[in-house]
Amino acid sequence: MNELKNDRLLRALLREPVDTTPVWIMRQAGRYLPEYRATRARAGSFMDLCQSPEMACEVTLQPLERFPLDAAILFSDILTIPDAMGLGLYFSEGEGPRFERPVQDAAAIRALGVPDPETELRYVTDAVRLIRRELDGRVPLIGFSGSPWTLATYMVEGGSSKEFARIKGMLYDDPSTLHHLLGVLAEAVTVYLNAQIAAGAQAVMVFDTWGGSLTPEGYREFSLAYMQRIVAGLTREHEGRRVPVTLFTKGGGAWLEVMAETGCDALGLDWTVNIGEARRRVGDRVALQGNLDPAVLYASAERVRAAARKVVEDFGPGSGHVFNLGHGIHPGIDPEKVAALVDEVHKAGMK
């Protein structure tokens, strides 16, 4: 594989010295970019786009052509695993992801198997290999998966949810069945991320989008424990380098200390936590990623720059900070604001 020309991201995730703060953006390949919208229209459907390695590669690289970002992130979806389990993923306008065959009883859950990434999810590993080849060592490639808890919420609810009525009912009434589902998903995520690493992903991230919906006790038992299991099972050295692992729980600011004990290398933060305070709480155990409010990008370029500077300054001196938004970039953002953001982070983060 090609030598990395810019390893800023990997160094920061491992709290090694860097020349400036690295930056990438959740959903950096997305609807705010006109070139993405053109490729998406050409693909036909969102899943057709995800399942074409060539198109997934094309959109993964699009933001790097515009902005001097310090990483590429695989273009895919967190729900590829349940789709490969046979649940029938589809996207409906205005409703987001839905499953034709949700799993809502013990029999359906116990019938689930762990997908083979090189057969059922071959389009993902093929995309990773193609992106690595096209990047030619320019920046590292990040692979990712949803967390077991987050995947389970979609699988049991049948799609997005505000109340989580079905899965919370299962959690309180039939926890053993839910634990079985989470155990299968933890194994599936571990196998899936290891396949991404083998194919060329140089860092990986676990997105726990719905962990913040749990109680403190519920979070430890039904989300964190399974992410810890994944971290323990991941390939941590590949191509002669350490493969950093980042955990991100949206709404998880209260639990940073226990998250830092999982063995991961970095924690993602949403915008409800001050990054300097988070750093004081976790000490030097992990790097931190984040955490600008994505809505700041609706403001003027000057305000975007000021807000970016504040996040960098709040983190303070030294390595261990990867700048990002606190969640995915909104579709209506002007790409020029992103250009201002990236430029300001690199200026403000000079070491």
From Swiss-Prot:
Which gene produces this protein?
Answer: hemE
Q: Name one GO cellular component term.
A: cytosol
Taken from the record, one Pfam family name reads URO-D
Q: What is this protein called?
A: Uroporphyrinogen decarboxylase
Q: Which subcellular locations apply to this protein?
A: Cytoplasm
Q: Which family does it belong to?
A: Belongs to the uroporphyrinogen decarboxylase family.
Where is the site described as Transition state stabilizer found in this chain?
Answer: 77
Q: Please verify whether the record's keywords include Cytoplasm.
A: yes
Which terms under GO biological process does the entry name?
protoporphyrinogen IX biosynthetic process from glutamate
On subunit structure and binding partners, the annotation says: Homodimer.
- The protein's organism comes out as Thioalkalivibrio sulfidiphilus (strain HL-EbGR7)
GO MF annotation list: uroporphyrinogen decarboxylase activity
Query: What's its EC?
Result: 4.1.1.37
Q: Where does substrate bind?
A: 27-31, 77, 154, 209, 327
- Which keywords has UniProt assigned to this entry? Cytoplasm, Decarboxylase, Lyase, Porphyrin biosynthesis
